[in-house]
């Protein structure tokens, strides 16, 4: 019997359709599809169109990636191009390594 997969809930805060925003979204989608196929929900929030959401979530810079679930909440601000840094920053690589240890 295989264990249930966790669902990851993420928010990506961007400022408009700038090259940085487009690159961050493209890179993040590639990482998520490779690592978490079908077990994630990603909401993209444009802080220029929805400044109240950025204020509520205390977003000070873009792009910012926030992992909401599973707890604890983690945020990465800035460049998302390094896959390993993104996974470590969100506490996802550690979980992945831990699960591999038990599946030997």
UniProtKB/Swiss-Prot annotation:
Lineage top rank: taxon: Bacteria
Thylakoid keyword on record: no
InterPro entries from the UniProt entry: Circ_KaiB, KaiB-like, KaiB_domain, Thioredoxin-like_sf
GO biological process, one term: circadian rhythm
CDD domains assigned to the protein according to its UniProt record, in alphabetical order: KaiB_like (cd02978)
UniProt-listed Pfam families: KaiB
Keyword NADP carried by entry: no
Membrane-crossing residue ranges in chain numbering: none
Keywords, alphabetical: Biological rhythms
Entry text on domains: Has 2 forms, fold switches to a thioredoxin-like fold (KaiB(fs)) when bound to KaiC.
Complex formation: The KaiABC complex composition changes during the circadian cycle to control KaiC phosphorylation. Complexes KaiC(6), KaiA(2-4):KaiC(6), KaiB(6):KaiC(6) and KaiC(6):KaiB(6):KaiA(12) are among the most important forms, many form cooperatively. Undergoes a major conformational rearrangment; in the free state forms homotetramers as a dimer of dimers. When bound to the CI domain of KaiC switches to a monomeric thioredoxin-fold (KaiB(fs)). KaiB(fs) binds CikA, leading it to dephosphorylate phospho-RpaA.
Function of the molecule: Key component of the KaiABC oscillator complex, which constitutes the main circadian regulator in cyanobacteria. Complex composition changes during the circadian cycle to control KaiC phosphorylation. KaiA stimulates KaiC autophosphorylation, while KaiB sequesters KaiA, leading to KaiC autodephosphorylation. Phospho-Ser-431 KaiC accumulation triggers binding of KaiB to form the KaiB(6):KaiC(6) complex, leading to changes in output regulators CikA and SasA. KaiB switches to a thioredoxin-like fold (KaiB(fs)) when bound to KaiC.
Family under the similarity heading: Belongs to the KaiB family.
Name by which UniProt lists this protein: Circadian clock oscillator protein KaiB
Underlying gene: kaiB
